[in-house]
Amino acid sequence: MLKKTAPNSPKRRRCSSFAAVDLVGSANRTFMVSVSLPKELILEILKRLPAKSVKRFHCVSKQWASMLSCPHFRELFLTRSSSAQPRLLFAIEKHNQWSLFSLPQRLTPYEKSSSSSVVVTPEFHMKFPPDGMLIYPRHDRRFSFGYASGLMYFYGMWINEHDYDGVPVICNPLTGRYASLPFLERYRKAFSFFGFDPIEKQYKVLFMAYPSGPDHHTVLTFGTGEMSWRKIECSVKHDIVSDGICINGVMYYLGDTSEFMTAFVVVCFDVRSETFSFIYPGSYCEVINYKGKLGLVFCDDYTDDAIELRLWVLEDKEKIEWSKYAYKLKDEKFSAHYVSIVGVSAAGEIVLSMADFTSKQPFYVFYYNPERNTLQCTEIQGFEEHHGTFDRRSRVRVFVDDCSSFYRFADHVEYLNVDEPKLLKSKIYDGPNAKIEWEEEEEEDEDEDQEKEEEDQWS
């Protein structure tokens, strides 16, 4: 119920049509002033708002929730919203808890190289998991954290004290909602990746037991119905070497078909068809998203202050045709900090990041523009404010109990998942974005019927 106001004060009531309605009261009578707005104009306004504001508007009425949840508005928002600026996403793990930060990418490349650093402070989003939950497993945490189209995937969490092996968890870092997936036997070791099919609008989890084999691969579709794991076949036996990325509905990760890390293979898993294909790069490489295409990065030399690398970009998936480039990046900070390739920004710059971090030294992100041959360094400050100090050096892609770990994603967008209330029902924390409660006033039956008719128009 909405709070009642004094008789002589202006009141606003919910309307069954898309209109602004004011009830202006006086001592003797009340006047209703209604200004109707075209639905197209309302959508034009709403799609320009930040995702947090649109989330709040879900609680205006059921009619508004229906409008904001329709596929048409979802597409409009994702393609034109001012909040859809690509960002760098930082996830820091310490003492069984993640802290999630993000930082806007540069939309225009740097004009020239600079030895001085730009100092920025990332936006803090949330901590995960909440009290009472723990990260699983405690020791081997390789490839236990994934990201796809706005949602995060955690390989395993102990939800309560009765859990023995933990269950996979999917979380939205923007709103703090999460959902646990069905339990799955994990054998001695197991790895999993998270992907999104943009055609069917479906999230899927690919799970692999170690040692991998034809019958050790399963997949799950994340949705509102009954979820279950399904066995799928993989023709090439391989071990997992790298983290995975999802590009246009295909998961990519590096594997090894030998026992001595000498026969590398890029495993390609089509999220929609649930089939595997394989690319053989010839040597170790990192997989990145290069402007919506698969990119392989080979680091040929790493001197005191320079990095020599080759970049292969997959231009034709059927014929396996590549565009190949070679670069030499030089910065005095390379001598003191090992860096790794993160990906490619929306401005076409190759993004590199420090591979380790402690509170006693700065943390840097580097932007290299291959067309202009410019390198710009950005110093990130403010992690300690929300997650305390880090005395130990943390390593990338290695989850160790007594040190922190970083994962960086170069294509993070604050994605408005309008189906989230159906998919992610639990709330991690009581922040301003998590408290979305319905406040409705009682209506006559004829108002509800009219509202239902207008809801159907947006379904």
Curated annotation (Swiss-Prot):
Q: Where is region (Disordered) located?
A: 434-459
- Family matches, as InterPro entries: F-box-assoc_dom_typ3 (IPR013187), F-box-assoc_interact_dom (IPR017451), F-box-like_dom_sf (IPR036047), F-box_dom (IPR001810)
Q: Which spans does this entry mark as compositional bias, Acidic residues?
A: 438-459
List residues of the F-box domain: 31-76
Any Pfam family hit = F-box
Q: Which NCBIfam families does the record cross-reference, listed alphabetically?
A: F_box_assoc_1
The name this protein goes by in its record: F-box protein At1g47340
> Origin organism of this chain?
Arabidopsis thaliana (Mouse-ear cress)
